[in-house]
Amino acid sequence: MARAPQPRRGAAAPGNALRALLRCNLPPGAQRVVVSAVLALLVLINLISDGSVVCAEALWDHVTMDDQELGFKAGDVIEVMDATNRAWWWGRAADCEGWFPASFVRLRVNQDEPADDEAPRARDGGAEAGGAEAQSSKDQMRTNVINEILSTERDYIKHLRDICEGYVRQCRKRADMFSEEQLRTIFGNIEDIYRCQKAFVKALEQRFNRERPHLSELGACFLEHQADFQIYSEYCNNHPNACVELSRLTKLSKYVYFFEACRLLQKMIDISLDGFLLTPVQKICKYPLQLAELLKYTHPQHRDFKDVEAALHAMKNVAQLINERKRRLENIDKIAQWQSAIEDWEGEDLLVRSSELIYSGELTRVTQPQAKSQQRMFFLFDHQLIYCKKDLLRRDVLYYKGRLDMDGLEVVDLEDGKDRDLHVSIKNAFRLHCGTTGDSHLLCTRKPEQKQRWLKAFAREREQVQLDQETGFSITELQRKQAMLNASKQQVTGKPKAKPPGLRGTPCRLKLFVPKAVGRPCYLMRQKHPALPSSRPQQQVLVLAEPRRKPSTFWHSISRLAPFRNTQESAALQKAQREDSQMHRSCPVRATAKLVTMDTSNSQLSGEVKGAQLLRVVILFSNV
Amino acid sequence: MPEQSNDYRVAVFGAGGVGKSSLVLRFVKGTFRESYIPTVEDTYRQVISCDKSICTLQITDTTGSHQFPAMQRLSISKGHAFILVYSITSRQSLEELKPIYEQICEIKGDVESIPIMLVGNKCDESPSREVQSSEAEALARTWKCAFMETSAKLNHNVKELFQELLNLEKRRTVSLQIDGKKSKQQKRKEKLKGKCVIM
């Protein structure tokens, strides 16, 4: 060997320094300097001490006549043994060792996995095939799927542990940086998820048959734990808030360094915190896939077959439920906004009892005394029906006129002809009859199909209410208040920058119009927002276009195409994205420059810092 | 602006079985598995160059989420670039991309500045082709995105796909190749050679 790489050194010293840093309160400037220096050192030493597993793939041929240099062909895998120098690394390929230019290779990502994971698998298969020729390939596939379920579960647990121990715990120690509320926003209920998954993976391990993995019976595990998975709902619903809060915090370099320190200390892979925070969302979507795969390779005679089948169904339901709740929650912002755009709103907020628009359209209301008929816009939500009057001139402006409580109402389909009570001839009519008060409302549509649609919508409203009762769906008061607040903020900020896309060519039935300023919405009057300008509120009105598809898919597309398109939700997302793109525009080069200038202001440390800067590049290369 | 975790996030979408995982695996690890393709990891990473510096390409796998749009939205909102994969042997898989594209539009707003690549995978199986490339090209034009046919199995166009996608990024210079400072390194090489001899 021409030159041995550095001897192995423990990572304890810099690790301790980091730990101390997280605890102490250095002035931010000094902290930054020390952190970047320590981080670089830590990773470098880690890299060297773990030299045996760092593999790089050659991007180009490296042809050399120098016997101290390592020659290789593009595509060769090189074991990197020393990367202390930025440009020239020491490594081994085949049986040779030598220097090679670092730029000629790229580090293999996912180094934690064996470089060639096909080989051992093939060997396993071969051995088993030799032992028992009869073992069908289906059993082998089942083994594969079971191994995968177990291994992804272990990986996932590790992720969760890393987040809980590496981030949450560290953040808790810094009450000066994070309030308890902020932590709750960023991390949601991830600690509960961690707890549940720990129990789950334990149950899986117990049922795992080590000798003959394909005989493992995992189905029951999923069935036993299916109710626990519902806590993912809260997590998924909170995730957008977490992203907004994170991108807000990471505008401050102190937080960026803190999170980076947490990551390195926990020796986590090179993904930013928001990447880690997305894993539970991804995970809960994957269970149905894995179970479907498992079922595919489970023989109907297998003892686990029925359980796997039931588990697949259960986990699909769980994911669907979570998805549905997420969607509903996205809707409440839209509903809040819709309400705040209605003039002369009276009574309690819509969200107190409702969370979904079921149907809407124009109906003729025939009132009792003089059989007068009025054209009104009706909006059917779960639990209540709101009716509004269109402005005579501005047809897109709506005035609140009243509401009906759907819980006590009976819908009566009326035949065309003379109405006995009102003595008028009616067509396409139905009656909403209130059992307790005896009130009755006669409503007519223009066309018979419209009446059918309304009748179906009323039925659907009842189904929805019942379903929500069964699954225990409700909006918390906090979520409701937040939505109303967002709606009022929306009024202040005015129209979101991006124009509502997707109106073209999409099967969109509810179209949104954003006219110019009109009167100030009533909701805002009642809320205490003295600073609100009355000049720029925004009106949003729904106009119902003719549905073309069959009603069953109607609600699906409504939810997807977002009747209330200009929402706070999307505004918040867009804001987050703008922030994202801003932070990325100033990517490494400028950021590096800034870091150096910042640091060199402390002249004593400047030399060291430039060194650290060099090493930072290595950090990016070497996080494995 | 302080230094940010400079990662570039790519989300890969597509119906089940079109080869999202295979594409990503082929790109990141260079492997392809004929018989059994496991659900890939949640997030892959790859070192790339960005504005002449180094950053992490973060590839988010969305496997499993195509049935759950509200959760898919969470992945979309964090992505910088998108790969929409269908299989050329399944028209249905192309159809299933449409709602995903609409969602991206809805969440991202101005899609023209966002790198989106429509990808027809499995082009090695052209005997059972259901989607002609001309059709997909036309769709890509209406979507104002780029289009490419790939084969993860034959490693055809896989690297090119990611390179093209990064080329579409106009707000910064991102590239798979980390060779921004070659000439400098050339100089450094001379220097280092001297050092090695001394030792």
Curated annotation (Swiss-Prot), chain B:
Similarity-based family: Belongs to the small GTPase superfamily. Di-Ras family.
GO MF assignments: GDP binding; GTP binding; GTPase activity
Post-translational modification: Ubiquitinated by the ECS(ASB11) complex via 'Lys-11'-linked ubiquitin chains, leading to its degradation by the proteasome.
Residues recorded as bearing Phosphoserine in the entry: 35, 126
Bilayer topology term: Lipid-anchor
Propeptide: 197-199
Keywords: Cell membrane, GTP-binding, Hydrolase, Lipoprotein, Membrane, Methylation, Nucleotide-binding, Phosphoprotein, Prenylation, Ubl conjugation
Sites of Cysteine methyl ester modification: 196
Biological role stated in the UniProt entry: Displays low GTPase activity and exists predominantly in the GTP-bound form.
Subcellular location per the Swiss-Prot or TrEMBL entry: Cell membrane
GO cellular component terms attached to this protein's record: plasma membrane
Residues holding GTP: 14-21, 33-39, 61-65, 121-124, 152-153
One Pfam entry name: Ras
Enzyme class, spelled out: hydrolase
InterPro entries the record matches: P-loop_NTPase, Small_GTP-bd, Small_GTPase, Small_GTPase_Ras-type
Catalytic activity entry: GTP + H2O = GDP + phosphate + H(+)
Tissues and organs where the protein is expressed, per its UniProt entry: Highly expressed in brain.
Protein name in UniProt: GTP-binding protein Di-Ras2
Covalently attached lipid (S-geranylgeranyl cysteine), positions: 196
Gene Ontology terms: biological process: signal transduction
Motif residue range(s): Effector region: 36-44
NCBIfam families the record matches: small_GTP
The enzyme's E.C. designation: 3.6.5.-
